[in-house]
Amino acid sequence: RDHIYPAATVVGTQGKELKIYFIASKAPGLGVENPQQVSAFLYPPEYSKDPPLFSRALIHRNDTQEIIFVSGTASILGHSTLHEGDVLKQLEVCVDNIRRLIKTAANENQCSAINLADMTQLKVYVKNPGDFTSVRNHLKRIIGGISTTCFIQADLCRDNLLVEIEALAIQATS
């Protein structure tokens, strides 16, 4: 792979407005991929003529901190959706995938040893508004509290995905 792609999440909304936010830096980041998932930029053409160009996570370091941006992470292993129709099982796979990304970041990129409890922000995208309460309660059972967790109703990149999580961790460097 010749490029380092950004961490990214793309979801649909009910409104007519396009909303984009991004963080830019002059320094390149370090891309992180989940060893249990096909990298999105290598997806087979059955998903899209042009594969999405993003890293599963990106590490950015400066003199005072290390930031891990985790792209929207869903219930996908290899390139296949798992647990169609079961939002709580999909949530568990999302969390497991984020744990793998954190472990890979630590092992392959000498990133600070962190765990899910160290995440400073989670955005949880839920397809069906009726699932908000069960997703919130199950997530709390799985990982406990995260300082900032936002639950957002959104259309996800595949019809059979019901939940997706984007995460952020910031660690001071010594």
Positions of predicted regions on the chain:
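N-terminal presequence-like segments and the immediate start of the first folded domain
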Residues: 1-174
